[in-house]
Curated annotation (Swiss-Prot):
<comment type="similarity">
    <text>Belongs to the krueppel C2H2-type zinc-finger protein family.</text>
</comment>
<feature type="zinc finger region" description="C2H2-type 13">
    <location>
        <begin position="476"/>
        <end position="498"/>
    </location>
</feature>
<feature type="zinc finger region" description="C2H2-type 6">
    <location>
        <begin position="280"/>
        <end position="302"/>
    </location>
</feature>
<dbReference type="GO" id="GO:0008270">
    <property type="term" value="F:zinc ion binding"/>
</dbReference>
<keyword id="KW-0862">Zinc</keyword>
<feature type="zinc finger region" description="C2H2-type 15">
    <location>
        <begin position="532"/>
        <end position="554"/>
    </location>
</feature>
<keyword id="KW-0238">DNA-binding</keyword>
<feature type="zinc finger region" description="C2H2-type 7">
    <location>
        <begin position="308"/>
        <end position="330"/>
    </location>
</feature>
<dbReference type="GO" id="GO:0006355">
    <property type="term" value="P:regulation of DNA-templated transcription"/>
</dbReference>
<feature type="zinc finger region" description="C2H2-type 1; degenerate">
    <location>
        <begin position="140"/>
        <end position="162"/>
    </location>
</feature>
<feature type="zinc finger region" description="C2H2-type 14">
    <location>
        <begin position="504"/>
        <end position="526"/>
    </location>
</feature>
<feature type="zinc finger region" description="C2H2-type 2">
    <location>
        <begin position="168"/>
        <end position="190"/>
    </location>
</feature>
<feature type="domain" description="KRAB">
    <location>
        <begin position="4"/>
        <end position="75"/>
    </location>
</feature>
<feature type="modified residue" description="Phosphoserine">
    <location>
        <position position="544"/>
    </location>
</feature>
<feature type="zinc finger region" description="C2H2-type 3">
    <location>
        <begin position="196"/>
        <end position="218"/>
    </location>
</feature>
<feature type="zinc finger region" description="C2H2-type 4">
    <location>
        <begin position="224"/>
        <end position="246"/>
    </location>
</feature>
<keyword id="KW-0863">Zinc-finger</keyword>
Length: 563
């Protein structure tokens, strides 16, 4: 079989057949013809009949004559094979169904005022039927060529993905794409247009598919179920992605560092780590992001929008994923389990972070001082040490922070709210993560053991900090006096000595402190609370260090030796 040409997939129409179509259908013909011409050029197929294309671009008839003239003329070309953008069935609908539906039952006998008019109309109608029948047969004959064209062009487009060529470039930001449809979707980012609106809540979307997916939030329907673990999803694509958790398959590998991913989208996101590119900028505050989704989520900080509400406790969230994660607090569900040590997590990303403990891999390196980290977020936080930047400021007291999350935690000090309560002892906390850490006191689970001295820890962060005692590493240095510290938090606390700042004030007696933890300990004096009880003799203490010291009376332990 020879190479595919324009003539292989063309349909010929006579003038009589052309006149069967109304103005709208003729315009449709022109649009499809020009669109397919562009597709052929893109696929590298030569089109010889350029006079016809020029004629169509100028909005003229496919031949130079008036429509009412009935003399026989050379046939016109029609390429209603509509590759990709119009599948085969559309061809049949365009002529076979649309024309027949429009003229098949025109009732010409009823509308005629005279016998002559009736005969004339009847003759015209028969001619139309002949025209439609001819058109139908030509469409059926063309089907096999359509399939050949589809197969050829799909293969051609598929090959482009492997070559890495991106011929379609955005004029706004310069980003390139391998397909025209991808460029079209991307351009909406710059226009901000959201034509698809949800009738239920009024939320608008850039794509109709996003609106369709969003509607399921209101119905709560989850028709796609995982056969492995029984978890249900509202989208088939989400189920497909979920299944990879069970198989552990990672097909997509980074050529830069060799790291592998189970999704191509994750690989694309990862690549930005190496380039450092942040093309999505917030117009409100100027902050830039690597992904458009992160920018969308960030914008909600400025608007204060929290559309996702927990039915259990009423807490609202900016993202549906945050609500899903939050619900596990109430259910206690921990579906993500570490195969290495058996520890389970409520969030998949936490499991991913946890796994690094076992590998001790640190792929994220600071260019300033050479220090390496196992998470990109830790590297980002570390970089602030060199810049000294604190962009997140508390409106209540003016204190500034390097991270937005730290500011969020800090704000709770001013509100005094403690929504997270320990079921074991009744103690309440302002932050959920602190409650999680507190619970370890009751379980005494300490999975992290130091190989150097045998000491065990209940948190990986405490274990990491402890290791520095043996290495003697003190990377955080005070510019004022030169003193170095193991932890950045210790340096922050130390700096207050030079400034004399005491931002944490007791509402009960007015006494001020330079650390929030010291204020918390101080408050116990007023309440008389002694939550730390010795299991050996029953004596209670208001601080955990005091209990630790007391226990040595029973154990006779003397850890401090004179050198």
């Amino acid at each position: 079989m020879g190479p595919l040409t324009f003539m292989d997939v063309a349909i010929e129409f006579s003038l009589e057949e052309w006149q069967c179509l109304d103005t709208a259908q003729q315009n449709l013909y022109r649009n499809v013809m020009l669109e397919n011409y562009r597709n052929l050029v893109f696929l590298g197929i030569a089109v010889s009949n350029l006079d016809l294309i020029t004629c169509l671009e100028q909005g003229k008839e496919p031949w130079n004559m008036k429509r009412h003239e009935m003399a026989a003329k050379p046939p016109a070309m029609c390429s209603h094979f509509a590759k990709d953008l119009r599948p085969e069935q559309y061809i049949k609908n365009s002529f076979q169904q649309v024309i027949l539906r429009r003229y098949g039952k025109c009732g010409y006998q009823k509308g005629c005022k005279s016998v002559d008019e009736h005969k004339l109309h009847k003759g015209g109608h028969k001619g139309l039927n002949r025209c439609v029948t001819t058109t139908q047969s030509k469409i059926v004959q063309c089907d096999k060529y359509v399939k050949v064209f589809h197969k050829y062009s799909n293969a051609k487009r598929h090959k482009i993905r492997h070559t890495g060529k991106n011929p379609f470039k955005c004029k706004e930001c310069g980003k390139s794409f391998c397909m025209l449809s991808q460029l079209t979707q991307h351009e909406i980012i710059h226009t901000g247009e959201k034509p698809y609106k949800c009738e239920e809540c009024g939320k608008a979307f850039k794509k109709s598919s996003n609106l369709t997916n969003h509607k399921i939030i209101h119905t709560g329907e989850k028709p796609y179920k995982c056969e492995e673990c029984g978890k249900a999803f509202n989208q088939s694509s989400t189920l497909t992605r979920h299944k990879i958790i069970h198989t552990g398959e990672k097909l997509y590998k980074c050529e830069e560092c060799g790291k592998a991913f189970n999704r191509s989208s994750n690989l694309t996101k990862h690549k930005i780590v190496h380039t450092g590119e942040k093309p999505y900028k917030c117009e409100e505050c100027g902050k830039a992001f690597k992904q458009s989704s992160n920018l969308t989520n960030h914008k909600k900080i400025h608007t204060g929008e929290k559309p996702y509400k927990c039915g259990e406790c009423g807490k609202a969230f900016t993202l549906s994923s945050h609500l899903t994660t939050h619900k596990r607090i109430h259910t206690g569900e921990k579906p993500y389990k570490c195969e290495e040590c058996g520890k389970a997590f409520s969030v998949f990303s936490t499991l991913t972070k946890h796994k690094i403990i076992h590998t001790e891999e640190k792929p994220y390196k600071c260019e300033e001082c050479g220090k390496a980290f196992n998470r990109s977020s830790h590297l980002t936080n570390h970089k602030v040490i060199h810049t000294g930047e604190k962009p997140y400021k508390c409106e209540e007291c003016g204190k500034a922070f390097t991270k937005s999350s730290t500011l969020t935690y800090h704000k709770v000090i001013h509100t005094g709210k403690k929504p997270y309560k320990c079921e074991e002892c009744g103690k309440a906390f302002s932050i959920f993560s602190i409650l999680t850490k507190h619970k370890v006191i009751h379980t005494e689970d300490k999975p992290y053991k130091c190989e150097e001295c045998g000491k065990t820890f209940n948190y990986s962060s405490n274990f990491t900090n402890h290791k520095k005692i043996h290495t003697g590493e003190k990377p955080y240095k005070c510019e004022e006096c030169g003193k170095s510290f193991i932890l950045s938090s210790h340096l922050t606390t130390h700096k207050i000595i030079h400034t004399g700042e005491k931002p944490y004030k007791c509402k009960e007696c007015g006494k001020a402190f330079n650390q929030s933890s010291t204020l918390m300990k101080h408050k116990i004096i007023h309440t008389g609370e002694k939550p730390y009880k010795c299991e050996e003799c029953g004596k209670a203490f208001n601080q955990s260090p005091n209990l630790t010291k007391h226990k040595r009376i029973h154990t006779k332990e003397k850890p401090y030796k004179c050198k």
